[in-house]
Design a protein with these regions (language model features):
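Mature N-terminal segment immediately following signal peptide/propeptide cleavage
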Residues: 1
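Primarily the internal scaffold of c-type cytochrome electron-transfer domains
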Residues: 125-207, 225
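Extended surface/linker regions that mediate inter-domain or inter-protein docking
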Residues: 4-152, 209-213, 217-219, 224-238
Length: 238
């Protein structure tokens, strides 16, 4: 019954279920271990403590493996950026671009905030996968010309150095990029701009709708969907 809705949403069971759901939606598959799952632990923290849902993406948090190695701790950290600066997320989505640009990370940020969906094209052995190669007609649409130009977005993200356990990241060196009509210099300004968009609010409500109904929303349900968007803009919390 409707009278029990508030109590159910405040329960530990809801926080657990929604954290698991959102973790499955925002990741490409299961993590290697419970100590490598920052999205799940941050989502549970956000819902449990009734924090603004935007904190999931831009909040000042550090999510690191706990001492036992069987989970992760969420602590406030002014240098944090939701889960996007957690080492495990950065390594997982660092990609393999030759110069260290996080093309995979750029796509994941766009997908998780706005719902962007792309169909990857599979190259052939010997194809030029460098910056110059990506400017070929078959590639430049996604990488340079569209509003979600992956190379442009990646230029404001940290750059990967090395591979595997020795992987590190350095600050971007390309300078500000023109993205979404703004001069964007780093990952924080990028994600903040995305979270301040209608596309972000719509995508978060798409996730809510799928969690509640087990399917995507459709056009005839627009009035209910719009109420979700308005509530997220006003109340801020899930």
């Amino acid at each position: 019954p409707q009278s029990q809705a508030d109590a159910l949403l405040a329960s530990a069971d809801f926080a657990e279920r929604y954290a698991r759901f959102i973790n499955s939606e925002l990741n490409g598959g299961p993590a290697s271990s419970a100590a490598d799952d920052p999205i799940y632990y941050l989502a549970k923290h956000i819902v449990t403590n009734d924090k603004p849902w935007s904190d999931m993406f831009i909040g000042p948090y550090a999510i690191t493996a706990n001492a036992a190695g069987d989970g992760m701790d969420v602590k406030e950290d002014a240098k944090g950026l939701g889960y996007f600066r957690s080492p495990s997320w950065m390594k997982r989505y660092s990609g393999n671009e030759a110069e260290g640009y996080m093309l995979v990370g750029a796509f994941r940020i766009l997908s998780n905030t706005t719902g962007l969906e792309l169909t990857p094209s599979i190259g052939n052995p010997g194809d030029d996968r460098t910056d110059q190669g990506r400017q070929a007609a078959a590639c430049r649409g996604c990488h340079f010309d569209s509003w979600y130009a992956l190379d442009t977005f990646a230029k404001v993200l940290p750059k990967r150095k090395g591979q595997g356990d020795t992987m590190t990241f350095t600050a971007p060196t390309e300078g500000p990029q023109q993205i979404l009509g703004k001069s964007i210099a780093d990952d924080k300004s990028l994600v903040t701009t995305l979270v301040d968009s209608d596309a972000w609010r719509f995508q978060q409500c798409r996730n809510v709708f799928k969690f509640v109904h087990g399917r995507p929303e459709n056009q005839c349900e627009a009035p209910v969907f719009d109420k979700c968007v308005d509530a997220l803009a006003g109340q801020k919390t899930i």
